[in-house]
């Protein structure tokens, strides 16, 4: 058996495959990504609105060291340079410093992994609330209210409340999902009885047999 990571384009802040009260969250919530429009048009509008090249020059990409995100930062920089002739500096800091700066909002753009611990949609979204850790320093009364309501709701109602929270984060550009990583287990033919929890990760071979 061999655990591998699968990387795919993000369809939202919450990855595919997670359930809420046994309901497929993504299928029920639908696509909550906002339509921001053409990037070049947005750039021109910002430039015409008074944002100078020197303002863009002060933008930096913050990422935690040892996270494996350096290549992603290079790809982003390459795309910006090609499309807009912009090049942003990359600032790589220790994980502890990275977390501290995320929480107090001391950054312009940060490449941060967002995890759904235990496969919980609520836990993933709660990270952006003050009570759940205050990831990115985000604080909003409506977000907190809907997230709190989802904790006591059930079924499709709970999905709708969580989807509203996810939509709000994306519409306000608190977070912009780039890609998802999901762990899968490759198993040789004939192996049965393995129990694999990708969120642990835990591999239980107690009842494993080979046919």
Where are these regions (language model features)?
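Structural transition elements
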Residues: 3-48, 68-71
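Short, solvent-exposed loop/beta-turn-alpha elements that line the ligand-binding surface or hinge
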Residues: 19-38, 51-54, 101-105, 123-149, ...
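Bilobed periplasmic-binding protein-like "clamshell/Venus-flytrap" ligand-binding domains
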Residues: 45-64, 155-189
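Ligand/substrate-recognition segments at binding pockets and active sites
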Residues: 44-116
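Solvent-exposed loop/turn segments at secondary-structure junctions
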Residues: 6-8, 18-21, 65-69, 96-97, ...
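Solvent-exposed, acidic/flexible segments
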Residues: 7, 29-39, 65-73, 95, ...
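Structured segments of extracytoplasmic/periplasmic soluble domains
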Residues: 1, 5, 42-49, 79-86, ...
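Small-molecule-sensing regulatory modules
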Residues: 71-75, 81, 87, 97-100, ...
């Amino acid at each position: 058996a061999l655990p591998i990571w699968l990387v795919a384009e993000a369809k939202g802040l919450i990855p595919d495959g997670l359930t809420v009260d046994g309901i497929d969250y993504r299928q029920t919530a639908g696509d909550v990504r906002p339509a921001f429009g053409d990037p070049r048009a947005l750039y021109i509008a910002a430039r015409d609105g008074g944002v100078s090249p020197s303002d863009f020059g002060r933008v930096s990409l913050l990422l935690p060291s040892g996270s494996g995100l350096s290549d992603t930062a290079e790809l982003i920089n390459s795309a910006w340079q090609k499309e807009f002739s912009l090049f942003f500096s990359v600032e790589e800091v220790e994980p502890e410093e990275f977390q501290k700066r995320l929480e107090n909002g001391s950054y312009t753009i940060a490449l941060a992994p967002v995890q759904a611990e235990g496969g919980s949609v609520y836990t993933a979204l709660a990270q952006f609330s003050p009570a759940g850790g205050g990831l990115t320093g985000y604080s909003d009364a409506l977000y907190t209210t809907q997230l709190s309501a989802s904790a006591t709701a059930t079924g499709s109602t709970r999905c709708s409340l969580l989807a509203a929270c996810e939509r709000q984060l994306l519409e306000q550009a608190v977070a912009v999902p780039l890609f998802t990583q999901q762990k899968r287990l490759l198993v040789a033919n004939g192996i049965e009885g393995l129990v694999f929890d990708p969120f642990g990760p835990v591999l239980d071979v107690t009842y494993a047999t080979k046919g």
